[in-house]
């Protein structure tokens, strides 16, 4: 009986040790804040300017690094700063949509960074009508 009690106590101590980890220091990590997370082109004509920009600010206390930015399809091309963004500074991700493709579109751009919110998904949408 004492062996079972000792075993149960050891198990409880082991499990509680797993949950006794030090809290993360989220306040000292970078925070990525976008002015907007979506852009609506509305209805545009085939071949029109498909460029838009997503401005963001590093709200953290250390340099922000955008590790990767990728679009949901090859018709959307993102450009992003490769150098670290200093605390309090702003920059932007430029997106070009291929407006040669006629029809409604709804695409996503996934931003991966070293921020607390390390994955942010941006959206673009619109409707491309044929040239007349």
What are these regions (language model features)?
Residues 1-24:
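Bacterial Sec-dependent N-terminal signal peptides
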Residues 20-48, 55, 116-132:
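Long, low-complexity ectodomains and other extracytoplasmic segments of secretory-pathway proteins
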Residues 37, 47-53, 100-108:
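Short, solvent-exposed loop/turn segments enriched in Ser/Thr/Gly
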Residues 39, 89-95:
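Short strand-edge motifs at loop-to-beta-strand transitions and within beta-strands
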Residues 42, 80-85, 96-97:
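Beta-strand-rich interaction surfaces with strong enrichment in secreted/lumenal proteins
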Residues 56-60:
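Asparagine-centered strand-capping/turn motif at beta-strand->loop junctions
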Residues 62-69, 121-123:
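Short, hydrophobic/aromatic beta-strand segments
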Residues 72-79:
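Short, solvent-exposed loop/linker segments at beta-strand-coil boundaries, enriched for Pro/Gly
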């Amino acid at each position: 009986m004492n062996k079972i009690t000792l075993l149960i106590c050891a198990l409880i101590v082991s499990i509680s040790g797993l949950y006794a980890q030090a809290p993360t220091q989220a306040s000292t990590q970078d925070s990525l804040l976008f002015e907007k997370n979506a852009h609506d082109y509305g209805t545009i004509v085939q071949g029109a300017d498909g460029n838009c920009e997503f401005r963001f600010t590093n709200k953290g206390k250390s340099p922000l690094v955008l590790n990767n930015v990728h679009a949901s399809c090859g018709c959307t091309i993102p450009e992003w700063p490769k150098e670290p963004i200093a605390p309090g500074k702003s920059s932007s991700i430029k997106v070009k949509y291929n407006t040669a493709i006629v029809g409604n579109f709804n695409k996503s751009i996934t931003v991966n960074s070293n921020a607390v919110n390390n994955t942010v998904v941006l959206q673009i949408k619109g409707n491309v009508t044929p040239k007349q």
